[in-house]
């Protein structure tokens, strides 16, 4: 609007000729001049404002340009990193392709080699199966030969065993037949062809089976009640009565021991058990008089003088034979092992030590069976030339 007014005033002044201006008065010229100056000043102010606005806009655009430059630089850096990453991934892809091709070639080669080896192994298996069949046939033939030899040997052994049994029946008189599986050793005077001698020789040839049988026998000793194994087989009446009286005395002592254990401390029991050994208790169990008269059958009886001086409650019995003494010691050890004490203490035997003691008891039984061959007096107390040992 000011530009339009200024332009209109300029046109007015420019169109007015000099003659007309000269005709104007001073007042009109002064008004015209002031009016033009005001218009000029307003135009100058407006122009200045416009320049400020332009400068402000330029500053904003410059800031925007700088920000865009920074963003562009970042994007260029990211683009460069992505290019490098793409190159790296492409290299890895190429390497993976090469590696996969190499693995494929290796797999084909290994598969062909495995097929060849499988074929070779199948051929070897066929050869081994053929050899196994031939060995089976050879083993069957050898078994048949062994069975034939066993039959021939059993035939010869049965004839010799009949002769040996006849000689034993004549020697022992009215003694009962011998139980081969009673756990004791066989007689050393038996014939070489008898079944007992053949069985003993068979055990020597197979020590592993003999050891396993001995362990089974020693473990079975604890499973049998004491009254089944306390009396040996074939003893005469005097020895049997003596053993029964010993059993009654053992029961009485066990009852006394239980009463003492109820009224005493564990320390006193431990000292008492340390002080008494199995053989010492057996010697205190049945003290026998020393003055006894021998009998013809190997047993003895108590004289009236000594029997009258026996303590009260003691029943006079016959003297125990030597074989019975050893047998009772063995039975005493077995009973001590079988007895389960309610209170455990430090002196208890371990399972290994118990097995060793049982094995020693079995050896004593075998020794007693062998000792009867050299002592006729003991033979009279035995039936079948043996004791009945632990089963």
From Swiss-Prot:
Keywords: Cell junction, Coiled coil, Developmental protein, Tight junction. It is found in: Cell junction, Tight junction; Cell junction, Adherens junction. Residues 182-194 have a biased composition (Low complexity). Residues 19-86, 116-146 form a coiled coil. InterPro entries: CCDC85. Residues 155-238, 278-303 are annotated as: Disordered. It holds the Pfam family CCDC85. Residues 157-175, 280-303 have a biased composition (Polar residues). GO terms for cellular component: adherens junction; bicellular tight junction. May play a role in cell-cell adhesion and epithelium development through its interaction with proteins of the beta-catenin family. May play an important role in cortical development, especially in the maintenance of radial glia. Belongs to the CCDC85 family. PANTHER family: COILED-COIL DOMAIN-CONTAINING PROTEIN 85C, RE60986P. This is Coiled-coil domain-containing protein 85C. It comes from Xenopus tropicalis.
């Amino acid at each position: 609007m000011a530009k339009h007014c200024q332009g209109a005033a300029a046109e007015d002044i420019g169109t007015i000729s000099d003659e007309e201006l000269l005709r104007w008065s001073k007042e009109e010229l002064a008004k015209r001049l002031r009016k033009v100056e005001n218009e000029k000043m307003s135009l100058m102010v407006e122009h200045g404002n416009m320049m400020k606005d332009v400068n402000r806009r330029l500053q904003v655009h410059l800031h925007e340009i700088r920000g865009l430059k920074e963003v562009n630089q970042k994007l260029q850096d990211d683009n460069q990193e992505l290019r490098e990453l793409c190159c790296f991934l492409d290299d890895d892809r190429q390497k993976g392709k090469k590696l996969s091709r190499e693995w494929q070639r290796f797999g084909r080669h290994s598969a062909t080699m495995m097929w060849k080896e499988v074929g070779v192994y199948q051929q070897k298996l066929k050869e081994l199966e053929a050899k196994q069949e031939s060995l089976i046939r050879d083993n069957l033939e050898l078994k048949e030969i062994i069975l034939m030899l066993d039959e021939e040997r059993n035939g010869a052994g049965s004839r010799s065993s009949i002769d040996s049994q006849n000689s034993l029946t004549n020697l022992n008189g009215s003694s009962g037949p011998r139980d081969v599986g009673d756990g004791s050793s066989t007689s050393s005077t038996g014939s070489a062809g008898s079944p007992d001698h053949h069985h003993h020789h068979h055990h020597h040839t197979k020590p592993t089976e003999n050891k396993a049988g001995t362990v089974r026998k020693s473990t079975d000793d604890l499973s049998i009640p004491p009254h089944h194994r306390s009396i040996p087989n074939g003893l005469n009446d005097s020895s049997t009565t003596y053993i029964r009286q010993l059993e009654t005395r053992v029961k009485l002592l066990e009852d006394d021991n239980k009463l003492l254990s109820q009224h005493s401390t564990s320390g006193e029991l431990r000292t008492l058990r340390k002080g008494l050994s199995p053989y010492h208790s057996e010697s205190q169990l049945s003290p026998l008089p020393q003055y006894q008269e021998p009998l013809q059958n190997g047993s003895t009886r108590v004289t009236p003088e000594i029997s009258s001086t026996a303590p009260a409650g003691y029943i006079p019995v016959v003297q125990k034979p030597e074989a019975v003494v050893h047998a009772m010691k063995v039975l005493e050890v077995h009973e001590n092992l079988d007895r389960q004490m309610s209170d455990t203490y430090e002196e208890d035997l371990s399972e290994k030590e118990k097995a060793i003691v049982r094995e020693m008891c079995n050896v004593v039984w075998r020794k007693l069976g062998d000792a009867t061959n050299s002592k006729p007096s003991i033979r009279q107390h035995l039936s079948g030339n043996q004791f009945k040992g632990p089963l």
